[in-house]
């Protein structure tokens, strides 16, 4: 797949040109023959051509750039017969429609990487594993532990739905055109449903409210958002009233979200 098109800055396109790196990324997905693979933004096919070599059962490609949609449409019959190509912005894809078991992979554009991962971990019920290349700063946030500078809303949200594993750093010279920052690979392993947030809308609202004031004490934040009997709830969960959001684990935030629901408080419907 050596056909080239001019990268579109408006789409945040940086094409991976290092075949060795592409091979390492796909290998992390641990594809077995016959498994279903979902690739977001295949572009010139740096990852796709390695995926073909594993003889997947179904290969679903979502591509926003019409040039690359045409390209992959022209080559798909040469490889895997069960290839479906959607000409679509991945942010608008109906993730709930995926049936069966899927593995997801992508070199995500920097400008939409966080938003896509947010959606995927909480909406794809049939995902067994995902491998993403993102801006290193985003990877740091995805893997961050409580009490660290990078720990925040994205960390808590994603780690509540999946185990996140750091892969490796990819330097700018591996791309065309070269980005100004390093990229990094992360692998996500979805957690069992019983370990995930029970009400994702409430959970999202709670963590966003808390991290808007990450340096304030929890008792002040909960009082401000109208959390009734917050002191008793904090004591029941085992959170100090003087604790700050950045020090709490995703499990504690999930328990706090459940306590909030029990208060029968009206909470915003938008997340």
Swiss-Prot record:
Q: Which InterPro entries match?
A: KsgA/Erm, rRNA_Ade_diMease-like_C, rRNA_Ade_Mease_Trfase_CS, rRNA_Ade_methylase_Trfase_N, rRNA_adenine_dimethylase, SAM-dependent_MTases_sf
Q: Which reaction does it catalyse?
A: adenosine(1518)/adenosine(1519) in 16S rRNA + 4 S-adenosyl-L-methionine = N(6)-dimethyladenosine(1518)/N(6)-dimethyladenosine(1519) in 16S rRNA + 4 S-adenosyl-L-homocysteine + 4 H(+)
State where the protein is found: Cytoplasm
* E.C. designation(s): 2.1.1.182
Q: Which UniProt keywords apply?
A: Cytoplasm, Methyltransferase, RNA-binding, rRNA processing, S-adenosyl-L-methionine, Transferase
Q: What is its main location?
A: cytoplasm
Q: Which residues cross the membrane?
A: none
Looking at the record's lineage, which domain of life comes first? Bacteria
From which residue to which does the signal peptide run? Answer: none
Give one Pfam hit by family name.
RrnaAD
Q: Which Gene Ontology molecular-function terms are recorded?
A: 16S rRNA (adenine(1518)-N(6)/adenine(1519)-N(6))-dimethyltransferase activity; RNA binding
* Residues the record lists as binding S-adenosyl-L-methionine: 14, 16, 41, 63, 89, 107
Protein's UniProt keywords contain Lipid metabolism: no
Which is one Gene Ontology cellular component term of this protein? cytosol
Matching entries from Gene3D superfamilies are given as: Ribosomal RNA adenine dimethylase-like, domain 2 (1.10.8.100), Vaccinia Virus protein VP39 (3.40.50.150)
Q: What does this protein do?
A: Specifically dimethylates two adjacent adenosines (A1518 and A1519) in the loop of a conserved hairpin near the 3'-end of 16S rRNA in the 30S particle. May play a critical role in biogenesis of 30S subunits.
PANTHER family xrefs: DIMETHYLADENOSINE TRANSFERASE, DIMETHYLADENOSINE TRANSFERASE-RELATED
The UniProt family comment states: Belongs to the class I-like SAM-binding methyltransferase superfamily. rRNA adenine N(6)-methyltransferase family. RsmA subfamily.
Its recorded name reads Ribosomal RNA small subunit methyltransferase A
- Provenance organism: Lawsonia intracellularis (strain PHE/MN1-00)
Q: What does the record give as the organism's lineage? A: Bacteria, Pseudomonadati, Thermodesulfobacteriota, Desulfovibrionia, Desulfovibrionales
């Amino acid at each position: 797949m050596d056909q080239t098109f001019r990268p579109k800055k408006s789409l945040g396109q940086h094409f991976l040109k290092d075949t060795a790196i592409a091979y390492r990324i796909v290998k992390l997905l641990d594809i077995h023959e016959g498994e279903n693979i979902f690739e977001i933004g295949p572009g010139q096919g740096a990852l796709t051509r390695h995926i073909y070599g594993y003889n997947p059962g179904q290969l679903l490609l979502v591509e926003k750039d019409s040039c690359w949609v045409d390209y992959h449409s022209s080559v798909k019959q040469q490889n895997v017969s069960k290839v479906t190509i959607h000409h679509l912005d991945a942010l608008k894809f109906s993730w709930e429609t995926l049936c069966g078991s899927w593995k997801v992979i992508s070199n995500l554009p920097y400008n939409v990487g966080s938003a896509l991962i947010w959606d995927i971990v909480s909406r794809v019920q049939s995902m067994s594993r995902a491998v993403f290349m993102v801006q290193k700063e985003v990877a740091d946030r995805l893997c961050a532990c409580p009490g660290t500078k990078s720990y925040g809303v994205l960390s808590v949200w994603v780690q509540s739905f999946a185990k996140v594993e750091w892969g490796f750093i990819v330097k700018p010279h591996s791309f065309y055109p070269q980005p100004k920052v390093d990229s990094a690979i992360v692998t996500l392993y979805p957690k069992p449903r019983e370990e995930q947030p029970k009400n994702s809308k409430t959970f999202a609202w709670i963590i966003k409210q808390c991290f808007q004031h990450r340096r304030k004490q929890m008792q002040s934040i909960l009082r401000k958002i109208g959390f009734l009997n917050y002191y008793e709830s904090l004591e029941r969960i085992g959170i100090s009233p003087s604790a700050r959001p950045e020090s709490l684990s995703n499990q504690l935030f999930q328990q706090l979200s459940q306590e909030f629901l029990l208060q029968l408080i009206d909470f915003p419907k938008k997340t």
